[in-house]
Design a protein with these regions (language model features):
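Conserved non-transmembrane functional hotspots
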Residues: 1-116
């Protein structure tokens, strides 16, 4: 039951991330929205690390792939934040060298739905 509840949180964080990214783009890619995305990604990592050992091997691979993307994204994020020391309305843009693994997200969501 606990693992299902933790996995269920991911549905919220995935949707929140998509919504926050849309707002980030719509509002000029500012630091305020980038901070919301960073917090959301940190929350995703927290959940993924809790459920990893309880998931089947193929889902563990998806978790590792998604975690890798977020790790690289977060490294770029921290580097730019340190360099710019931005205010909320400042533009905050960097290019992540690792694309978002949509299939991994989809596999994790489908795994959760199979448990419910």
């Amino acid at each position: 039951v606990k693992m299902k509840a933790e996995l269920g949180k991911l549905l919220f964080y995935f949707e929140r991330g998509r919504n926050s990214y849309t707002k980030y783009i719509e509002h000029g890619s500012t630091y305020l929205y980038a901070r919301i995305l960073k917090h959301n990604n940190d929350s995703i990592i927290e959940v993924l690390s809790k459920v990893y050992s309880f998931c089947p091997d193929e889902i563990q691979q998806d978790i590792v792939e998604l975690t890798y993307h977020i790790d690289v994204w977060s490294s770029h994020w921290r580097c730019l934040e340190k360099k710019l020391n931005p205010r909320f309305n400042d533009q905050f843009i960097f290019h992540n060298t690792v694309g978002y693994p949509k299939r991994a997200e989809s596999n994790i969501v489908n795994y959760y739905r199979g448990l419910v």
